[in-house]
């Protein structure tokens, strides 16, 4: 079944590349300055273990990487992808970050340098802004008498389609193509592709498939496989050509079916013969007659 799970998987695949991950961090946290380099990142086991009700349970981040300076961990960065607003997102992120701090507090890690955990929530919606809680205080029902003693937790939320154009153009990796697409769809309700060369072709086209629900992007992967200097402009030309061809084939089929229906109504062909010539079941052919 294709759906949100597919989107999640494809987003993870693109962002797992260090050049894409570092690009996202540098633009969103450091205003485009190249602070985090590709070779300073290492993958984190995306599963955090919690013990609840006497049972061991696993939580899964979308993607996370350690940022190193030599052998010292400077930070752990996590990315959480959202295609629609989610009410409980502050709790989820709080749980992920908390689990990493608990890990650092374990006895076997007592002598290790302690590092901060930073999670970025990337919202990919372009039809509406994020309209759900962004912090624990917005989510929790807190008695005012105890509120001064409750620690708030605010998400680092980035609404990609709503970033300034200047910020969008700071991205240097394939993530720019996604950000540009989301921005254009929000502002113009349409997308005009540029001539930027795609580095991770398969992953980006799978992501575009999941985001747009247009499976012609996925089918185009084999057509461009092995080619150098593939751009979104070329990809869209191929996608459009597929659409035209599909329309032509459907038009021919519709014309053929209409002729067969006339022959059936004139008593020249039986429904069984007409259905056979149309390469469909009798039940489906009868639906056309109705």
At which residue positions do the language-model features occur?
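Elongated, amphipathic alpha-helical interaction scaffolds
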Residues: 1-290
């Amino acid at each position: 079944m294709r759906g949100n799970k597919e989107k999640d998987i494809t987003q993870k695949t693109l962002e797992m590349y260090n050049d894409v991950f570092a690009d996202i961090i540098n633009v969103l946290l450091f205003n485009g300055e190249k602070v985090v380099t590709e070779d300073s990142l290492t993958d984190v086991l995306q599963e955090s273990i919690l013990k609840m009700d006497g049972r061991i349970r696993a939580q899964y981040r979308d993607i996370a990487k350690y940022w190193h300076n030599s052998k010292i961990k400077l930070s752990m960065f996590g990315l959480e992808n959202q295609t629609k607003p989610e009410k409980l997102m502050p709790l989820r992120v709080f749980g992920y970050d908390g689990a990493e701090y608990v890990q650092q507090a374990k006895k076997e890690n007592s002598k290790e340098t302690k590092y901060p955990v930073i999670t970025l929530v990337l919202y990919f919606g372009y039809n509406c802004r994020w309209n759900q809680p962004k912090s624990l205080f917005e989510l929790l029902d807190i008695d005012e008498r105890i509120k001064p003693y409750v620690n708030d937790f605010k998400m680092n939320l980035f609404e990609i389609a709503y970033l300034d154009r200047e910020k969008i153009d700071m991205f240097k990796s394939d993530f720019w193509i996604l950000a540009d697409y989301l921005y254009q769809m929000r502002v113009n309700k349409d997308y005009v592709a540029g001539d930027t060369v795609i580095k991770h072709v398969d992953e980006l086209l799978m992501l575009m498939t999941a985001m747009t629900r247009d499976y012609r992007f996925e089918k185009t992967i084999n057509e461009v496989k092995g080619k150098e200097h593939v751009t979104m402009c070329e990809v869209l030309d191929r996608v459009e050509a597929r659409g035209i061809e599909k329309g032509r084939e459907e038009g021919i089929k519709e014309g053929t079916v209409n002729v067969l229906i006339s022959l059936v109504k004139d008593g020249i062909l039986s429904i069984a013969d007409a259905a056979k010539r149309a390469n469909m079941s009798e039940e489906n052919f009868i639906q056309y007659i109705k």
